């Protein structure tokens, strides 16, 4: 049975964010702002339905989905694109594949104790973020 990811998580650290943003062709100005951010994550997980909110002082992003059901994801507020997205469980990892202009794009969430890990991929870039559960 997959873990329940419901909770509010505070940013702890990240690695390789600039390479990830470059792989998405994000402008230099926006990359510089993004590298200063320490986003929080809020996840609501009820059965197969999930809402994931990324909250920061610059921009917030919310995605809602049903696990295993493909949907069109509007990422215009993130990088100006739309893509076809599907999120599935691979054992205890929540795995997202985003099909569109950028190859090998997606993310993976998993828990280790009170820590939430997020691995973001685009092209050959991999960014790792770590969050701590606060409630």
From Swiss-Prot:
Annotated Gene Ontology cellular component terms: cytosol; extracellular exosome; nucleus
InterPro entries in alphabetical order: Calycin, Fatty_acid-bd, ILBP, Lipocln_cytosolic_FA-bd_dom
GO biological process, one term: fatty acid transport
Keyword set, alphabetical order: Cytoplasm, Retinol-binding, Transport, Vitamin A
Domain of life: Eukaryota
Pfam families (UniProt xref): Lipocalin
Expressed in which tissues: Higher expression in adult kidney and liver and to a lesser extent in adult and fetal spleen, adult lymph nodes and appendix, and fetal liver and kidney. Strongly decreased in hepatocellular carcinoma tissues (at protein level).
GO molecular function, one term: retinoid binding
Major subcellular location class: cytoplasm
Compartments where found: Cytoplasm
Domain notes: Forms a beta-barrel structure that accommodates hydrophobic ligands in its interior.
Function: Intracellular transport of retinol.
Family the entry assigns: Belongs to the calycin superfamily. Fatty-acid binding protein (FABP) family.
Protein name: Retinol-binding protein 5
Gene source species: Homo sapiens (Human)
Species classification: Eukaryota, Metazoa, Chordata, Craniata, Vertebrata
Gene: RBP5
